[in-house]
Amino acid sequence: MSRQANRGTESKKMSSELFTLTYGALVTQLCKDYENDEDVNKQLDKMGFNIGVRLIEDFLARSNVGRCHDFRETADVIAKVAFKMYLGITPSITNWSPAGDEFSLILENNPLVDFVELPDNHSSLIYSNLLCGVLRGALEMVQMAVEAKFVQDTLKGDGVTEIRMRFIRRIEDNLPAGEE
């Protein structure tokens, strides 16, 4: 019995390592295809956005999470459910703005950066920028326009990885006239 449980753990670890290495290969290829880090950062964000737009359906179906009533509740669901479900980590939520429209997600351990060192000639590369795009894309599909950006990164010598989230506005559904 313990042998089967051990296999499941090994399989999960292999899957996460394969994901990490595959992501690294993707970023490496983007660095070869684009002339500067800023263009790579934009592509990672764009790819993440497209993933987030599709991932939200899977998330809502698998998590049974209802509609969030405010940005604080949204932050809790992102940190405690979504990150745990897809990356196996639970970031902490800190640095709320007084207005309650901004917060930080602190990732003590970013699984995307396992086995990674940034070369000196890519100092402005935001290696995990895909995550910001995923957050923006997923939240846009539930009528929330947000800004997400990295403000600290362990790959750049910081102690933790920090994603700053800012609520911009609620997106209103624009239905054609006569439809509801």
UniProtKB/Swiss-Prot annotation:
It comes from the Eukaryota. GO terms for biological process: COPII vesicle coating; endoplasmic reticulum to Golgi vesicle-mediated transport; intra-Golgi vesicle-mediated transport; vesicle coating; vesicle tethering. Its main location: Golgi. The keyword Transport applies. A lipid is attached at C68 (S-palmitoyl cysteine). GO terms for cellular component: cis-Golgi network membrane; cytoplasm; cytosol; endoplasmic reticulum; Golgi membrane; TRAPP complex; TRAPPII protein complex; TRAPPIII protein complex. It is found in: Golgi apparatus, cis-Golgi network; Endoplasmic reticulum. CDD domains: TRAPPC3_bet3. Keywords: Endoplasmic reticulum, ER-Golgi transport, Golgi apparatus, Lipoprotein, Palmitate, Transport. Pfam families: TRAPP (PF04051). Homodimer. Component of the multisubunit transport protein particle (TRAPP) complex, which includes at least TRAPPC2, TRAPPC2L, TRAPPC3, TRAPPC3L, TRAPPC4, TRAPPC5, TRAPPC8, TRAPPC9, TRAPPC10, TRAPPC11 and TRAPPC12. Heterodimer with TRAPPC6A. The heterodimer TRAPPC3-TRAPPC6A interacts with TRAPPC2L. Heterodimer with TRAPPC6b. The heterodimer TRAPPC6B-TRAPPC3 interacts with TRAPPC1 likely providing a core for TRAPP complex formation. Belongs to the TRAPP small subunits family. BET3 subfamily. May play a role in vesicular transport from endoplasmic reticulum to Golgi. This is Trafficking protein particle complex subunit 3. The gene is TRAPPC3.
